[in-house]
Amino acid sequence: MDAIKKKMQMLKLDKENALDRAEQAEADKKAAEDRSKQLEDELVSLQKKLKATEDELDKYSEALKDAQEKLELAEKKATDAEADVASLNRRIQLVEEELDRAQERLATALQKLEEAEKAADESERGMKVIESRAQKDEEKMEIQEIQLKEAKHIAEDADRKYEEVARKLVIIESDLERAEERAELSEGKCAELEEELKTVTNNLKSLEAQAEKYSQKEDKYEEEIKVLSDKLKEAETRAEFAERSVTKLEKSIDDLEDELYAQKLKYKAISEELDHALNDMTSI
Protein backbone atom coordinates (compact mmCIF):
# COMPACT_ATOMS: atom_id res chain seq x y z
CA MET A 1 0.00 0.00 0.00
CA ASP A 2 2.73 2.40 0.86
CA ALA A 3 4.36 1.76 -2.44
CA ILE A 4 1.10 2.48 -4.22
CA LYS A 5 0.57 5.68 -2.21
CA LYS A 6 4.08 6.71 -2.85
CA LYS A 7 3.65 6.02 -6.53
CA MET A 8 0.34 7.91 -6.52
CA GLN A 9 2.03 10.87 -4.90
CA MET A 10 4.78 10.72 -7.46
CA LEU A 11 2.21 10.56 -10.27
CA LYS A 12 0.33 13.45 -8.70
CA LEU A 13 3.54 15.37 -8.41
CA ASP A 14 4.39 14.52 -12.00
CA LYS A 15 0.90 15.65 -13.00
CA GLU A 16 1.33 18.92 -11.17
CA ASN A 17 4.75 19.36 -12.74
CA ALA A 18 3.29 18.50 -16.13
CA LEU A 19 0.50 21.05 -15.56
CA ASP A 20 3.07 23.61 -14.50
CA ARG A 21 5.16 22.83 -17.56
CA ALA A 22 2.03 22.97 -19.74
CA GLU A 23 1.11 26.34 -18.26
CA GLN A 24 4.68 27.48 -18.66
CA ALA A 25 4.70 26.17 -22.24
CA GLU A 26 1.39 27.94 -22.87
CA ALA A 27 2.83 31.11 -21.42
CA ASP A 28 6.00 30.65 -23.45
CA LYS A 29 3.87 29.99 -26.53
CA LYS A 30 1.88 33.16 -25.92
CA ALA A 31 5.06 35.10 -25.26
CA ALA A 32 6.56 33.64 -28.43
CA GLU A 33 3.44 34.55 -30.36
CA ASP A 34 3.53 38.07 -28.91
CA ARG A 35 7.25 38.30 -29.70
CA SER A 36 6.55 36.99 -33.21
CA LYS A 37 3.78 39.56 -33.64
CA GLN A 38 6.05 42.27 -32.33
CA LEU A 39 8.84 41.15 -34.64
CA GLU A 40 6.41 41.07 -37.57
CA ASP A 41 5.29 44.60 -36.70
CA GLU A 42 8.92 45.68 -36.36
CA LEU A 43 9.69 43.98 -39.68
CA VAL A 44 6.81 45.81 -41.39
CA SER A 45 7.97 49.06 -39.78
CA LEU A 46 11.55 48.41 -40.86
CA GLN A 47 10.36 47.57 -44.37
CA LYS A 48 8.42 50.84 -44.49
CA LYS A 49 11.41 52.66 -43.07
CA LEU A 50 13.67 50.90 -45.57
CA LYS A 51 11.30 51.91 -48.40
CA ALA A 52 11.29 55.51 -47.17
CA THR A 53 15.06 55.41 -46.82
CA GLU A 54 15.41 54.03 -50.35
CA ASP A 55 13.09 56.77 -51.65
CA GLU A 56 15.06 59.40 -49.78
CA LEU A 57 18.29 57.83 -51.03
CA ASP A 58 16.95 58.05 -54.60
CA LYS A 59 16.05 61.67 -53.98
CA TYR A 60 19.49 62.44 -52.57
CA SER A 61 21.13 60.53 -55.42
CA GLU A 62 19.20 62.69 -57.88
CA ALA A 63 20.19 65.80 -55.92
CA LEU A 64 23.79 64.60 -55.90
CA LYS A 65 23.62 64.06 -59.66
CA ASP A 66 22.20 67.56 -60.15
CA ALA A 67 24.90 68.99 -57.88
CA GLN A 68 27.60 67.16 -59.85
CA GLU A 69 26.14 68.49 -63.12
CA LYS A 70 26.05 72.01 -61.65
CA LEU A 71 29.63 71.55 -60.45
CA GLU A 72 30.75 70.39 -63.90
CA LEU A 73 28.93 73.34 -65.50
CA ALA A 74 30.52 75.73 -62.99
CA GLU A 75 33.96 74.24 -63.66
CA LYS A 76 33.36 74.67 -67.41
CA LYS A 77 32.28 78.28 -66.90
CA ALA A 78 35.32 78.89 -64.70
CA THR A 79 37.57 77.38 -67.39
CA ASP A 80 35.93 79.55 -70.05
CA ALA A 81 36.29 82.62 -67.81
CA GLU A 82 39.97 81.83 -67.22
CA ALA A 83 40.44 81.50 -70.98
CA ASP A 84 38.68 84.85 -71.49
CA VAL A 85 40.89 86.45 -68.84
CA ALA A 86 44.01 84.99 -70.49
CA SER A 87 42.84 86.28 -73.87
CA LEU A 88 42.22 89.71 -72.38
CA ASN A 89 45.67 89.69 -70.80
CA ARG A 90 47.20 88.88 -74.18
CA ARG A 91 45.20 91.68 -75.84
CA ILE A 92 46.22 94.13 -73.13
CA GLN A 93 49.86 93.14 -73.62
CA LEU A 94 49.54 93.70 -77.39
CA VAL A 95 47.91 97.09 -76.80
CA GLU A 96 50.67 98.06 -74.37
CA GLU A 97 53.34 97.02 -76.88
CA GLU A 98 51.60 98.99 -79.65
CA LEU A 99 51.33 101.99 -77.30
CA ASP A 100 55.06 101.76 -76.52
CA ARG A 101 55.86 101.72 -80.25
CA ALA A 102 53.59 104.73 -80.82
CA GLN A 103 55.30 106.60 -77.98
CA GLU A 104 58.69 105.80 -79.49
CA ARG A 105 57.53 107.09 -82.89
CA LEU A 106 56.13 110.21 -81.23
CA ALA A 107 59.41 110.81 -79.37
CA THR A 108 61.33 110.46 -82.66
CA ALA A 109 58.97 112.87 -84.40
CA LEU A 110 59.28 115.40 -81.56
CA GLN A 111 63.06 115.13 -81.71
CA LYS A 112 63.05 115.74 -85.48
CA LEU A 113 60.66 118.66 -85.00
CA GLU A 114 62.98 120.14 -82.38
CA GLU A 115 65.92 119.76 -84.78
CA ALA A 116 63.88 121.44 -87.53
CA GLU A 117 63.02 124.32 -85.18
CA LYS A 118 66.70 124.72 -84.32
CA ALA A 119 67.57 124.78 -88.04
CA ALA A 120 64.84 127.38 -88.61
CA ASP A 121 66.24 129.52 -85.78
CA GLU A 122 69.72 129.29 -87.29
CA SER A 123 68.33 130.25 -90.72
CA GLU A 124 66.51 133.18 -89.15
CA ARG A 125 69.73 134.35 -87.50
CA GLY A 126 71.45 133.99 -90.90
CA MET A 127 68.70 136.10 -92.47
CA LYS A 128 69.24 138.81 -89.87
CA VAL A 129 72.99 138.81 -90.61
CA ILE A 130 72.30 139.02 -94.37
CA GLU A 131 69.79 141.84 -93.84
CA SER A 132 72.35 143.69 -91.71
CA ARG A 133 74.96 143.32 -94.47
CA ALA A 134 72.48 144.50 -97.12
CA GLN A 135 71.63 147.53 -95.00
CA LYS A 136 75.32 148.40 -94.69
CA ASP A 137 75.74 148.05 -98.46
CA GLU A 138 72.79 150.39 -99.02
CA GLU A 139 74.36 152.92 -96.68
CA LYS A 140 77.60 152.65 -98.67
CA MET A 141 75.69 153.17 -101.92
CA GLU A 142 74.03 156.29 -100.47
CA ILE A 143 77.44 157.62 -99.51
CA GLN A 144 78.71 156.89 -103.02
CA GLU A 145 75.72 158.71 -104.50
CA ILE A 146 76.49 161.71 -102.33
CA GLN A 147 80.11 161.62 -103.46
CA LEU A 148 78.94 161.39 -107.07
CA LYS A 149 76.71 164.43 -106.57
CA GLU A 150 79.64 166.32 -105.11
CA ALA A 151 81.79 165.36 -108.10
CA LYS A 152 79.13 166.64 -110.49
CA HIS A 153 78.92 169.85 -108.50
CA ILE A 154 82.65 170.28 -108.80
CA ALA A 155 82.43 169.66 -112.56
CA GLU A 156 79.81 172.41 -112.86
CA ASP A 157 82.03 174.81 -110.97
CA ALA A 158 84.88 174.03 -113.39
CA ASP A 159 83.28 176.30 -116.04
CA ARG A 160 83.73 179.29 -113.79
CA LYS A 161 87.21 178.34 -112.72
CA TYR A 162 88.98 177.40 -115.94
CA GLU A 163 92.45 177.56 -114.42
CA GLU A 164 91.56 174.90 -111.91
CA VAL A 165 89.64 172.76 -114.37
CA ALA A 166 92.59 170.78 -115.69
CA ARG A 167 93.90 169.85 -112.28
CA LYS A 168 90.55 169.33 -110.62
CA LEU A 169 89.12 167.56 -113.70
CA VAL A 170 91.81 164.89 -113.49
CA ILE A 171 91.08 164.49 -109.81
CA ILE A 172 87.34 164.43 -110.43
CA GLU A 173 87.64 161.88 -113.26
CA SER A 174 89.84 159.73 -111.09
CA ASP A 175 87.36 160.01 -108.21
CA LEU A 176 84.53 159.33 -110.62
CA GLU A 177 86.21 156.16 -111.92
CA ARG A 178 86.79 154.93 -108.40
CA ALA A 179 83.21 155.77 -107.51
CA GLU A 180 81.94 153.89 -110.56
CA GLU A 181 84.10 150.89 -109.66
CA ARG A 182 82.73 150.97 -106.12
CA ALA A 183 79.22 151.30 -107.51
CA GLU A 184 79.75 148.31 -109.82
CA LEU A 185 81.23 146.36 -106.94
CA SER A 186 78.28 147.28 -104.74
CA GLU A 187 75.86 146.27 -107.50
CA GLY A 188 77.62 142.89 -107.78
CA LYS A 189 77.44 142.44 -104.02
CA CYS A 190 73.78 143.42 -104.06
CA ALA A 191 73.11 140.78 -106.73
CA GLU A 192 74.94 138.19 -104.63
CA LEU A 193 72.97 139.25 -101.57
CA GLU A 194 69.70 138.97 -103.49
CA GLU A 195 70.65 135.47 -104.67
CA GLU A 196 71.62 134.47 -101.14
CA LEU A 197 68.38 135.98 -99.85
CA LYS A 198 66.39 133.87 -102.38
CA THR A 199 68.25 130.75 -101.26
CA VAL A 200 67.55 131.50 -97.59
CA THR A 201 63.90 132.22 -98.41
CA ASN A 202 63.58 128.89 -100.22
CA ASN A 203 65.22 127.14 -97.27
CA LEU A 204 62.78 128.81 -94.90
CA LYS A 205 59.83 127.73 -97.05
CA SER A 206 61.17 124.18 -97.12
CA LEU A 207 61.60 124.23 -93.33
CA GLU A 208 58.09 125.62 -92.87
CA ALA A 209 56.66 122.85 -95.09
CA GLN A 210 58.65 120.25 -93.16
CA ALA A 211 57.48 121.71 -89.83
CA GLU A 212 53.87 121.61 -91.04
CA LYS A 213 54.38 117.98 -92.10
CA TYR A 214 55.76 117.08 -88.65
CA SER A 215 52.84 118.94 -87.05
CA GLN A 216 50.39 116.84 -89.09
CA LYS A 217 52.25 113.67 -88.07
CA GLU A 218 52.16 114.80 -84.44
CA ASP A 219 48.37 115.30 -84.66
CA LYS A 220 48.07 111.85 -86.23
CA TYR A 221 50.18 110.28 -83.45
CA GLU A 222 48.10 112.06 -80.80
CA GLU A 223 44.94 110.67 -82.40
CA GLU A 224 46.46 107.16 -82.48
CA ILE A 225 47.49 107.49 -78.84
CA LYS A 226 43.95 108.59 -77.94
CA VAL A 227 42.47 105.58 -79.79
CA LEU A 228 44.95 103.23 -78.10
CA SER A 229 44.16 104.77 -74.71
CA ASP A 230 40.43 104.20 -75.30
CA LYS A 231 41.14 100.60 -76.33
CA LEU A 232 43.28 100.12 -73.22
CA LYS A 233 40.50 101.49 -70.98
CA GLU A 234 37.99 99.18 -72.69
CA ALA A 235 40.35 96.19 -72.20
CA GLU A 236 40.82 97.09 -68.52
CA THR A 237 37.02 97.34 -68.07
CA ARG A 238 36.52 93.93 -69.69
CA ALA A 239 39.31 92.46 -67.56
CA GLU A 240 37.66 93.80 -64.38
CA PHE A 241 34.31 92.33 -65.49
CA ALA A 242 35.98 88.96 -66.17
CA GLU A 243 37.64 89.04 -62.74
CA ARG A 244 34.28 89.75 -61.07
CA SER A 245 32.73 86.89 -63.09
CA VAL A 246 35.51 84.54 -62.00
CA THR A 247 34.99 85.64 -58.37
CA LYS A 248 31.27 84.90 -58.62
CA LEU A 249 31.97 81.52 -60.21
CA GLU A 250 34.47 80.66 -57.49
CA LYS A 251 31.86 81.55 -54.84
CA SER A 252 29.26 79.41 -56.65
CA ILE A 253 31.73 76.53 -56.78
CA ASP A 254 32.44 76.92 -53.04
CA ASP A 255 28.69 76.90 -52.30
CA LEU A 256 28.22 73.79 -54.45
CA GLU A 257 31.16 72.08 -52.75
CA ASP A 258 29.67 72.90 -49.32
CA GLU A 259 26.27 71.60 -50.44
CA LEU A 260 27.89 68.46 -51.88
CA TYR A 261 29.80 67.88 -48.65
CA ALA A 262 26.58 68.26 -46.61
CA GLN A 263 24.78 65.82 -48.93
CA LYS A 264 27.65 63.34 -48.56
CA LEU A 265 27.41 63.58 -44.75
CA LYS A 266 23.65 63.11 -44.91
CA TYR A 267 24.04 60.17 -47.30
CA LYS A 268 26.66 58.64 -45.00
CA ALA A 269 24.34 58.98 -41.98
CA ILE A 270 21.46 57.39 -43.90
CA SER A 271 23.74 54.56 -45.08
CA GLU A 272 24.88 53.91 -41.51
CA GLU A 273 21.27 53.91 -40.28
CA LEU A 274 20.31 51.53 -43.09
CA ASP A 275 23.24 49.24 -42.25
CA HIS A 276 22.15 49.16 -38.59
CA ALA A 277 18.59 48.31 -39.61
CA LEU A 278 19.78 45.51 -41.89
CA ASN A 279 22.05 44.18 -39.16
CA ASP A 280 19.14 44.20 -36.71
CA MET A 281 16.98 42.30 -39.22
CA THR A 282 19.77 39.80 -39.84
CA SER A 283 20.30 39.22 -36.13
CA ILE A 284 16.56 38.63 -35.69
Swiss-Prot record:
<keyword id="KW-0007">Acetylation</keyword>
<comment type="function">
    <text>Binds to actin filaments in muscle and non-muscle cells. Plays a central role, in association with the troponin complex, in the calcium dependent regulation of vertebrate striated muscle contraction. Smooth muscle contraction is regulated by interaction with caldesmon. In non-muscle cells is implicated in stabilizing cytoskeleton actin filaments.</text>
</comment>
<dbReference type="GO" id="GO:0097718">
    <property type="term" value="F:disordered domain specific binding"/>
</dbReference>
<keyword id="KW-0009">Actin-binding</keyword>
<dbReference type="GO" id="GO:0060048">
    <property type="term" value="P:cardiac muscle contraction"/>
</dbReference>
<feature type="modified residue" description="Phosphoserine">
    <location>
        <position position="186"/>
    </location>
</feature>
<keyword id="KW-0175">Coiled coil</keyword>
<keyword id="KW-0514">Muscle protein</keyword>
<dbReference type="GO" id="GO:0030016">
    <property type="term" value="C:myofibril"/>
</dbReference>
<dbReference type="GO" id="GO:0007015">
    <property type="term" value="P:actin filament organization"/>
</dbReference>
<dbReference type="GO" id="GO:0051015">
    <property type="term" value="F:actin filament binding"/>
</dbReference>
<protein>
    <recommendedName>
        <fullName>Tropomyosin alpha-1 chain</fullName>
    </recommendedName>
</protein>
<feature type="modified residue" description="Phosphoserine">
    <location>
        <position position="45"/>
    </location>
</feature>
<dbReference type="GO" id="GO:0042803">
    <property type="term" value="F:protein homodimerization activity"/>
</dbReference>
<keyword id="KW-0963">Cytoplasm</keyword>
<feature type="modified residue" description="Phosphoserine; by DAPK1">
    <location>
        <position position="283"/>
    </location>
</feature>
<comment type="similarity">
    <text>Belongs to the tropomyosin family.</text>
</comment>
<dbReference type="InterPro" id="IPR000533">
    <property type="entry name" value="Tropomyosin"/>
</dbReference>
<dbReference type="GO" id="GO:0097512">
    <property type="term" value="C:cardiac myofibril"/>
</dbReference>
<dbReference type="GO" id="GO:0015629">
    <property type="term" value="C:actin cytoskeleton"/>
</dbReference>
<dbReference type="GO" id="GO:0046982">
    <property type="term" value="F:protein heterodimerization activity"/>
</dbReference>
<feature type="modified residue" description="N-acetylmethionine">
    <location>
        <position position="1"/>
    </location>
</feature>
<dbReference type="GO" id="GO:0042802">
    <property type="term" value="F:identical protein binding"/>
</dbReference>
<dbReference type="GO" id="GO:0030017">
    <property type="term" value="C:sarcomere"/>
</dbReference>
<dbReference type="Pfam" id="PF00261">
    <property type="entry name" value="Tropomyosin"/>
</dbReference>
<keyword id="KW-0206">Cytoskeleton</keyword>
<feature type="modified residue" description="Phosphoserine">
    <location>
        <position position="174"/>
    </location>
</feature>
<feature type="region of interest" description="Disordered">
    <location>
        <begin position="1"/>
        <end position="38"/>
    </location>
</feature>
<keyword id="KW-0597">Phosphoprotein</keyword>
<feature type="modified residue" description="Phosphoserine">
    <location>
        <position position="271"/>
    </location>
</feature>
<feature type="coiled-coil region">
    <location>
        <begin position="1"/>
        <end position="284"/>
    </location>
</feature>
<feature type="compositionally biased region" description="Basic and acidic residues">
    <location>
        <begin position="12"/>
        <end position="38"/>
    </location>
</feature>
<feature type="modified residue" description="Phosphoserine">
    <location>
        <position position="206"/>
    </location>
</feature>
<feature type="region of interest" description="Disordered">
    <location>
        <begin position="116"/>
        <end position="136"/>
    </location>
</feature>
<feature type="modified residue" description="Phosphoserine">
    <location>
        <position position="252"/>
    </location>
</feature>
<dbReference type="GO" id="GO:0005884">
    <property type="term" value="C:actin filament"/>
</dbReference>
<comment type="subunit">
    <text>Homodimer. Heterodimer of an alpha (TPM1, TPM3 or TPM4) and a beta (TPM2) chain. Interacts with HRG (via the HRR domain); the interaction contributes to the antiangiogenic properties of the histidine/proline-rich region (HRR) of HRG. Interacts (via N-terminus) with LMOD2 (via N-terminus) and TMOD1 (via N-terminus).</text>
</comment>
<feature type="modified residue" description="Phosphotyrosine">
    <location>
        <position position="261"/>
    </location>
</feature>
